UniProtKB/Swiss-Prot annotation:
Binding partners and assembly: Heterotetramer of two alpha and two beta subunits.
GO biological process: succinyl-CoA metabolic process; tricarboxylic acid cycle
Sites where the protein binds substrate: 265, 322-324
Name of this protein: Succinate--CoA ligase [ADP-forming] subunit beta
HAMAP family given in the database record: Succ_CoA_beta (MF_00558)
Pfam families named among the record's database cross-references: ATP-grasp_2 (PF08442), Ligase_CoA (PF00549)
Amino acid sequence: MNLHEYQAKELLAGYGLPVQGGILAHNGEEAAAAYDKLGGKFAVVKAQVHAGGRGKAGGVKVVKSREEAKEVAESLIGTNLVTYQTDANGQPVNSVLVCEDMYPVQTELYLGAVVDRSTRRITFMASTEGGVEIEKVAAETPEKIFKVTVDPLVGLQPCQAREVAFQLGLKDKQINEFVKLMTGAYKAFVENDFALFEVNPLAVRENGALACVDGKIGIDSNALYRLPKIAELRDKSQENERELKASEFDLNYVALEGNIGCMVNGAGLAMATMDIIKLKGGQPANFLDVGGGATKDRVVEAFKLILEDKSVQGVLINIFGGIVRCDMIAEAIVAAVKEINVDVPVVVRLEGNNAELGAKILNESGLKLTSADGLNDAAEKIVAAVNA
């Protein structure tokens, strides 16, 4: 689950991090009032969406009057912002954050942290190249990224934070200020089950003080049951409607931009299925894992979910029967096709537990369902059907 910038800053401020001041506005009048309250020579109006690249997409604007703040807010709120991190439809802008004047600054730094699966530890990353995408820095000048791995048994040590401060070129009081900032970030990361933390840029102001100008936080969704206050911050308007519906039925669904819907049990098999569809010249429309313990109701809902995507021109169902029985899947497929009145080609590949019985149910259903003998055959048939 992702947080908005204003939510991330509020959370980080609670752990002692110096964040750029800002006031949330839901309309032009509130934005104008926020500008007056901040009282600076200018302010920055930022669209609140769950996506990066807002500046280049026109979602971050500098304003020099209350009238301009109102005008910019009204031009953003109620629209969809399209960035390089969104799909073609973009993300809805329901509010803007009117931020205080902090510029000019001495320099802009970067500080982030992730859960490193290879080391099974939290890894902090810092760079002197703040204000630009860290992916670009990693690709062009990787030597400018400094990493610190934290032992979970002892936590982040002050000496580790000081070492990062030295590498960033900080001096005197800035070092202690940075140690406090990084320690607070680590505490927030652990206590709130972050999956991602990023401050970009971390500004060094003209007076030498540090300030978090932006804040990006991703929460491990599996931990939300023990984070009720964090769970309340969830903004469902920023999530794909079908992905949101899928979560209600414990389905793992990710929307893509192809035209071949996929229903598979098991994440690995789902990825392999998408790969072979691409190999055969097709384009998968989604990743959908119904899980190892799929029930008939979940399979029916999964089918409905796939067909709600109007770009889907065919469906490939690939089931390996282990825990789940292929005959139960076949019954669910038949029920779903009858209920929804499917008018696109459907190719089904069943292997494993009760696969023969499942194939019999499909063949005797009287419906236009194409059986496949193996994954290769299934991919070829669905690609051919869609291109026919």
